[in-house]
Regions:
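N-terminal secretory/membrane targeting signals
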Residues: 1-25
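Hydrophobic alpha-helical segments and their helix-loop boundaries in membrane
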Residues: 2, 23-253
Length: 253
């Protein structure tokens, strides 16, 4: 079931990769009419088709959550949230900007994996050279390879022990439903590590400003208000956004 969910999400993600090719060939597109009616089914296949449509609609509603769980989005958005809080401006950049930047960085970082899925799974499936099951297997394996590279062994060992599974000898012995939460734990650990490194210089500025204000007897003046311009100045002088983007990108290699 998890493999089918991941494959269907990958199909929708890869649409923008193949849409230029489709429109350049001027192939007439036939739009299907999908309806769900409450009535008596004359054949078992009609009930199965209706259930498949309902399952597809459910998958579409869960697509954002699945995208977050199996890609680099979690680490990126958490780190950018730490940047906002470390600067002392929780509302700037706005949440919409943070989410948008996280999505585009996710597509950039995941581009090799998506290209591999398109070449090995989606394109052969659309050409009719492989079956749906084989395409799902290849697509999920590409995502599993990415998640294995970013997952720490202790997180995998923790989830394997919770699942009461025997000690795996190969990667194929680890189920996808065990790999995904282990991957998320590793992503959160990496994001919090980067967040700690981001906080250190801004914390030093806060301590220096607070000490100066106390020595001048200005204890009623909020240190955060005074330190914010200095934090912004430091962030601009060191080209903070370039450093953050570079660090996030290199952390996945």
């Amino acid at each position: 079931m998890i493999k089918k969910l991941l494959f269907l999400i990958l199909v929708f993600i890869m649409v923008f990769f193949i849409s230029p090719l489709v429109f350049s060939q001027e192939i007439p597109l036939v739009l299907p009419k999908i309806t769900i009616e409450a009535g008596e089914a004359s054949q078992p296949q009609e009930l199965v088709l209706s259930l498949q449509i309902l399952l597809l609609l459910t998958i579409l509603s869960l697509a954002p959550a699945i995208l977050i769980m199996v890609t680099s989005f979690t680490r990126i958005v958490v780190v950018l949230g730490f940047v906002r809080n470390a600067l002392g401006s929780p509302q700037i950049p706005p949440t919409a900007v943070v989410i948008g930047l996280s999505l585009f960085l996710t597509f950039f970082i995941m581009a090799p994996t998506f290209s591999q899925i398109q070449d090995n799974a989606l394109s052969p499936y659309l050409a009719g050279s492989i079956t749906q099951e084989e395409a799902m297997h290849r697509g999920v394996n590409s995502l599993r390879d990415f998640m294995f590279r970013q997952t720490q062994e202790k997180d995998l060992a923790l989830l394997v022990s919770f699942a009461n599974l025997p000690r795996p000898q190969m990667r194929d012995d680890i189920p996808t439903h065990v790999l995904i939460p282990a991957f998320i734990l590793s992503e959160l650990r990496a994001a919090f590590t980067l967040g700690f490194l981001i906080y250190i210089p801004f914390l030093v500025i806060d301590m220096v400003v607070a000490s100066i204000l106390m020595s001048m007897g200005m204890m009623m003046l909020p240190p955060v208000m005074i330190s914010l311009p200095f934090k912004l100045l430091l962030f601009v002088l060191v080209d903070g956004w370039d450093l953050i983007t570079r660090g996030l990108t290199l952390s996945f290699r």
